[in-house]
Amino acid sequence: PFEFHHIESNHPRYVMSYHWHVEYEIIRILKGSLTVTLNEKSFIAMPGDIIFVHSGILHSGIPDDCVYQCIVFDGNFFLKNNSACAGYIQKILHQEIMIYHHFSPKHPDICDVVNSLFDALWKKPVGYEMTVIGQFYHFFGLVFGNHYYLESVSRTRRDYKRILQLKQVLDFIEHNYASPLTLQQLSASVSMSPKYFCRF
């Protein structure tokens, strides 16, 4: 249920191109810097920083002499066989709350737990599976206990529509990448004129 990636300059996906997925993702920066874009907002993540990417968020990362790691996971995993925590997890899955997307070493509680989580998946000592699951619950517990989230997030209809259109274009490119693509085709995939699409 957990996909782990260690990414250095020789990795085929060193530059994290703009993409999205239904799974959640946690990124930690080990060295250098990573210019992270979430939807249409960018910031620079430095060594020791932790980035939390919600389900469905368009995101990319431009590395600068960077070594970073990612864990991609299905949030529904945490609903199984654990009714005591289900109410909290559902708030995350239903986007009633949005966990802060950027934690720095100024949040040592979060950094310690997330670093332990990454180290367990990276080094895989005996029993690491229990450490991983336990540290995920520990992370969520800290998020709720310290209010490291935004409540009842409302996206403006205009912003929501733009993000939806960006996702449609990315899907179109992904499904037709083997063929030459024209501006006309890209703009038509989101029902726009080529002129307006270029300003989009």
Predicted features, each with a name:
Residues P1-I7, L58-W122, G141-L150:
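A hydrophobic/aromatic-rich effector-binding and dimerization subdomain
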Residues P1-M46, I50, P63-D65, C85-Y88, ...:
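Generic protein-terminus/edge-of-domain signal
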Residues N10, L150-R157:
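Short, Lys/Arg-enriched N-terminal segment that forms or immediately precedes the first helix
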Residues L30, C111-P125, L170, E174-Y177:
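Regular secondary-structure segments
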Residues H54-G56:
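Residue-level recognition of conserved beta-strand edge/terminus positions
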Residues D109, R158-V169:
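N-terminal positioning helix adjacent to the helix-turn-helix/winged-helix DNA-binding module
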Residues L121-H138, Y160:
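All-alpha amphipathic helical-bundle segments outside canonical DNA-binding/catalytic cores
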Residues G145-Y148, Q168, F172-F200:
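Basic/polar phosphate-binding segments, predominantly the helix-turn-helix DNA-binding elements
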